[in-house]
């Protein structure tokens, strides 16, 4: 995309419902919604089977049941959704620090200066979606474009579990055919008002002028005019830099010796280096090893460190494993802690 920005919009597919279907296989092939089932309750979301009956988010549960009598409604598990969202955010951070979360299930990523995947935003989006599926057994859709507006529109083009790329040379053609219904900020009433004046697609707006649009939609006219030309100059609103980096693996079978744990750490260390690459300007201040035992209790041993040292992880493992009390190990993890701001004079050192 040359000097253009490379923005990815990731949108999880029916996030809450997908988690319920993942955790409870009996829900996988039935119409499912998450929300309350009382007479005044509304739905948070629904799966694609339910959507075929017209069931939608924010719909009263009683209406949803009328549309789909065999709809299964389950109460949400917000703690699980938040933890899963945190895991997804960790996957994003492997590729860029420039992340703007919009909700638990969607975010913008700026990968303009990313070096992974040869700097290809398309490949990065594919890798992120693959990581989410392989590690969390959930699917996500993605839009890749030169700005936030187009990336968000694009992420909806090939849902579910797909992605759409709008390169700079395709922007004009893509936007020209775009229905005004798809522009954020245009609800049914505004669209109806525009429609009455002959505006149906962005092409219609492009042939008009801001003054004429102001007479119809007021202050929104300028934004509408720019978006109809594919222009959106907003930067990502990055809330804060990550304070740590972690990688862990839940083992297929519990292991029962320190040497077996060391082999796992050797493997995790190489993956940690890969994930560390996008954060090479951050100053490391801490290393840690985490073990979770057969009984699901866990322990973490940390120490101060200004570089990522494999030998130090092995030393920390020895201390952590001494707390096992003959319990098997089911999870092994490595952590790095960062200083609050990037070190200006100190370059990150990687001891291989």
UniProtKB/Swiss-Prot annotation:
InterPro entries: DNA/RNA_pol_sf (IPR043502), DNA_pol_Y-fam_lit_finger_sf (IPR036775), DNA_pol_Y-fam_little_finger (IPR017961), DNA_polymerase-Y (IPR050116), DNApol_IV (IPR022880), IMS_HHH_1 (IPR053848), Rev_trsase/Diguanyl_cyclase (IPR043128), UmuC (IPR001126). Its EC number is 2.7.7.7. Gene3D superfamilies: 3.30.70.270, 3.40.1170.60, 5' to 3' exonuclease, C-terminal subdomain (1.10.150.20), DNA polymerase, Y-family, little finger domain (3.30.1490.100). Its cofactor is Mg(2+). One of its GO terms (molecular function) is magnesium ion binding. The active site is at residue 106. It holds the Pfam family IMS_C. The keyword Transferase applies. Mg(2+) binds at residues 11, 105. Belongs to the DNA polymerase type-Y family. Poorly processive, error-prone DNA polymerase involved in untargeted mutagenesis. Copies undamaged DNA at stalled replication forks, which arise in vivo from mismatched or misaligned primer ends. These misaligned primers can be extended by PolIV. Exhibits no 3'-5' exonuclease (proofreading) activity. May be involved in translesional synthesis, in conjunction with the beta clamp from PolIII. This is DNA polymerase IV. It comes from Colwellia psychrerythraea (strain 34H / ATCC BAA-681) (Vibrio psychroerythus). The gene is dinB.
